Amino acid sequence: MSNRLSYWEYLHQELKLNADIQSQLVVLDLFAGCGGFSLGFKAAGFQTIGYEMLADAAATYTRNLQDPCYCQTLEIGQDLCNHPDVIIGGPPCQPFSVGGLQKGPRDSRDGLPIFIDAIARYQPEIAIFENVRGMLYKNRQYLEKIVAELERLNYRVDIKLINAVNYGVPQKRERLFVVAYQTAWNWPEAETLAIPYTAGDAIYDTASTIPIGAKFLTPSMLEYIGRYEAKSKCVKPRDIYLDIPCRTLTCRNLSGATSDMLRLLLPDGRRRRLTVREAARLQSFPDWFELVGSENSQFNQIGNAVPPLLAKAIAKSVKMTLENKPSRPTDYFSPFPQQLKLPFA
């Protein structure tokens, strides 16, 4: 990728949707959210079908991708889609995130059994899910069970921590990706960037302004944040610095008045929260992408999404694999060669 393109130019070039170049390859997106993962696949030429339980997110998906997104609470055994080539998704990550207390499989929000059930019933060529990096550590035993179950279904499995900043996203966002495949898989190569895109590249036109309805941090908020940062031994305030990529966007630090909320330092010394559009740009949603719902709902949709630029890089690897499928499976080495033989549930 050339840095001669501005971030905006690159974003709109990569995520342009062209109905004339859609292939016959169908992607089923479970726990689809507002469609960040699907947007990357749609931009790579796939047809997409989404399922999402939250009405605002499902409406956002349909409005922008113009492919169906069914607003339903998913259940095991549910009829979804005939013969998808690929299944993707972001099963709720709260069971494995620090913010969600890392309860793992004991958490009723765990959507992975539903995701695995869909793979077992529809047998796609490739299935990919994204989750927080905490799943690889505190909940590693559960991850091993998932890998073992996928291998029992005759899939090969590969796992990788991927940082979105290496794929053109102006944000340091590390997430776990798990790929189940039948014949072959190659991870997308990181973009060759002389300098990663920065927060300033994404929001330079608004960062020093006071937009209508701007929400400023109150003195009590600033005092609370100051105590938190002192206790955490922060070297410098955790503002958004325009000359480097932004830190990870989450539902918590976008919508909540919390100690680690994302905020901008204005020239007059005041601090304000990000706007929805600024957050969307930092997550690599183009400006034509319209979100539905209240401000809090829109922030949550953005914080939960797979960055579309990263999603497209993955989609291109999937498409290359499906279009150049080898005649025989490649050599396979399990990521957990001595997995615990525990039942998956």
Curated annotation (Swiss-Prot):
Q: Which domain of life is it from?
A: Bacteria
**UniProt key word Transferase:** yes
Query: Which EC numbers does the record give?
Result: 2.1.1.37
User: Catalysed reaction per UniProt?
Assistant: a 2'-deoxycytidine in DNA + S-adenosyl-L-methionine = a 5-methyl-2'-deoxycytidine in DNA + S-adenosyl-L-homocysteine + H(+)
Q: Which GO terms describe its biological process?
A: DNA restriction-modification system; methylation; negative regulation of gene expression via chromosomal CpG island methylation
Q: Which InterPro entries match?
A: C5-Methyltransferase (IPR050390), C5_DNA_meth_AS (IPR018117), C5_MeTfrase (IPR001525), SAM-dependent_MTases_sf (IPR029063)
Q: Where is the SAM-dependent MTase C5-type domain?
A: 25-325
Q: Where is the active site?
A: 93
Q: Name one GO molecular function term.
A: DNA (cytosine-5-)-methyltransferase activity
Q: Supply the enzyme class, top level.
A: transferase
SUPFAM superfamilies for the chain? S-adenosyl-L-methionine-dependent methyltransferases
Q: Which UniProt keywords apply?
A: DNA-binding, Methyltransferase, Restriction system, S-adenosyl-L-methionine, Transferase
For this chain, the family text in UniProt reads: Belongs to the class I-like SAM-binding methyltransferase superfamily. C5-methyltransferase family.
Record NCBIfam families: dcm
In Swiss-Prot or TrEMBL terms, this protein is called Type II methyltransferase M.AplI
Question: What is the organism field in this record?
Answer: Arthrospira platensis (strain NIES-39 / UTEX 3086 / IAM M-135) (Spirulina platensis)
